[in-house]
Curated annotation (Swiss-Prot):
The keyword Endoplasmic reticulum applies. This is Palmitoyltransferase ZDHHC1. Its main location: membrane. The chain crosses the membrane at residues 50-70, 75-95, 183-203, 239-259. Disulfide bonds: none annotated. Residues 1-268 are annotated as: Mediates interaction with STING1. Residues 131-181 form the DHHC domain. Residues 1-11, 19-34 have a biased composition (Polar residues). It is a multi-pass membrane protein. GO terms for biological process: antiviral innate immune response; peptidyl-L-cysteine S-palmitoylation; positive regulation of defense response to virus by host; positive regulation of NLRP3 inflammasome complex assembly; positive regulation of protein localization to endosome; positive regulation of protein oligomerization.
Length: 484
């Protein structure tokens, strides 16, 4: 099964080879071991093998029986010789490649009479382990692979050719290449002959009637002969055209397939690779593409559910940004907890199980922004507390001067001890401008400074400014007026 809950399209190995029987019951008939195939003549034949034989017969019959005899008289011997040599050579190498047993030497020495044992994955992880095949029960070479179609180890395994119905290995690889090359050359030559006949039929049909059997039919141009000169058979002109056109179409298709196959194996030989090694190297990329296609082929509803589950797992730790009202309520309810959590308000839990947070793809979240909340000027700072009175030990003039200085300065609210002061930045001491008097007492700056102060972000408690007792009173040694 794949990610879309669909069965995989990959072809699994044959059940009779790879499925281990149950330990409780004996092997069922469908789980009996498969016999090894010796070569391409072993039963059963593959459908593509039969198609290859039929195409060879069709090309040979139409080429030698219909098209070559219609060539000009002086071209006929060359046509028979060239096409005959190519077709005969292809037949020899093709039959040889089919008949050769490409199995490993140790496998060929073993008898093919009985079926091989069934592979049990509970006992072995791979068919070939430490250069020993667990199915063939022989030691094999490092380049040998076990073919599931032939059920045997092939030395220098390249691929299993369905057209030959045989494995292609070190023993028959060159024969396979010669078979492909000769087939391509023969089909190309046959397509050229068929094209010439098809064109000359409309341009100058008399050039196709040079055989002596056409001399008695000079006045009957619609009558043609096939299978000349051994067994002439009369036919009509449309039959000649249909056969030539059909051969051209099949020939072009065969040329494309054979040419592609030959170029591919030339590429493999240049890079010193086998078909099996090439497939293994490109398998990860192909599987990734197949997985992407399977995900795209999923129904939209199934894909949206899977994406929702993914985003819910991925973004479950993200807490939404609290609104301004929630932050204000949390500030008024518990200022210490609000400061400890850096201003984050825990969202309320859903009242029912039906309330789910949708993924960003369904309900997009806005980008969180830092909000600055301003307290009104009539708040904490406007509440004035009386400053502690200093000890009066001086003259009346100095007492009046001290009182005038005290009244001229704006009162500062002492919020508590110095340990209770909290700040979120290193420049917190500069957030509120403080004017120092002659006695060292603190006062707020000018009205312009108070205007700028109202635009700054404040915490739950205003910072406290303490007047040091060492400042003293007027006239004392620690006081500001005692300086010379």
């Amino acid at each position: 099964m794949n990610i879309c809950n669909k069965p995989s399209n990959k072809t699994a190995p044959e059940k009779s080879v790879w499925t281990a029987p149950s330990q409780d019951s004996g092997p069922s008939p469908e789980l009996q071991g498969q016999r090894s195939r010796r070569n391409g003549w072993s039963w059963p034949p593959h459908p593509l093998q039969i198609v290859a034989w039929l195409l060879y017969l069709f090309f040979a019959v139409i080429g030698f029986g219909v098209l070559v005899p219609l060539l000009p008289h002086h071209w006929v011997p060359a046509g028979y010789a060239c096409m005959g040599a190519i077709f005969a050579g292809h037949l020899v190498v093709h039959l040889t490649a089919v008949s050769i047993d490409p199995a490993d030497a140790n496998v060929r020495d073993k008898s093919y009479s009985g079926p091989l044992p069934i592979f049990n994955r509970s006992q072995h992880a791979h068919v070939i382990e430490d250069l020993h095949c667990n199915l063939c029960d022989v030691d094999v070479s490092a380049r040998s692979k076990h073919c599931s179609a032939c059920n045997k180890c092939v030395c220098g395994f390249d691929h299993h050719c369905k057209w030959l119905n045989n494995c292609v290995g070190e023993r028959n690889y060159r024969l396979f290449l010669h078979s492909v090359a000769s087939a391509l050359l023969g089909v190309l030559l046959l397509v050229l002959v068929a094209t010439y006949v098809f064109v000359e039929f409309f341009v100058n049909p008399m050039r196709l009637r040079t055989n002596q059997h056409f001399e008695v039919l000079k006045n009957h141009t619609d009558v043609w002969f096939v299978f000349l000169p051994a067994a002439p058979v009369e036919t009509q002109a449309p039959a000649i055209l249909a056969l030539a056109a059909l051969l051209i179409l099949l020939g072009l298709l065969s040329t494309a397939l054979l040419g592609h196959l030959l170029c591919f194996h030339i590429y493999l030989m240049w890079h010193k690779l086998t078909t099996y090694e090439y497939i293994v190297q490109h398998r990860p990329a192909q599987e990734a593409k197949e997985t992407h296609k399977e995900l795209e082929s999923c129904p939209r509803k199934v894909r949206s559910i899977q994406e929702m589950e993914f985003y819910m797992r991925t973004f479950s730790h993200v807490r939404p940004e609290p609104s301004g009202q929630a932050r204000t309520a949390a500030l008024n309810a518990n200022p210490s907890q609000f400061l400890a959590t850096q201003g984050q308000v825990e969202p309320p839990l859903p009242s029912s199980s039906d309330t789910l947070a949708l993924p960003p793809r369904i309900q997009p979240q806005k980008k969180r922004k830092r909000r600055v909340y301003r307290l009104p000027r009539s708040g904490v700072l406007d509440r004035e507390l009386p400053l502690p009175r200093l000890r009066e030990t001086g003259t009346p003039s100095r007492r009046s001067s001290s009182s005038s200085d005290s009244t001229s300065a704006s009162p500062v609210h002492a919020g508590g001890s110095a340990g209770a002061y909290y700040s979120a930045s290193a420049e917190s001491m500069e957030e509120i401008p403080v004017a120092q008097t002659r006695l060292g007492s603190a006062a707020l700056g000018a009205p312009g400074a108070r205007g700028r102060e109202s635009g700054l972000a404040l915490q739950a408690r205003s910072p406290a400014v303490f007047v040091s007792p060492s400042s003293g009173e007027p006239g004392t040694p620690g006081g500001g007026d005692g300086l010379p």
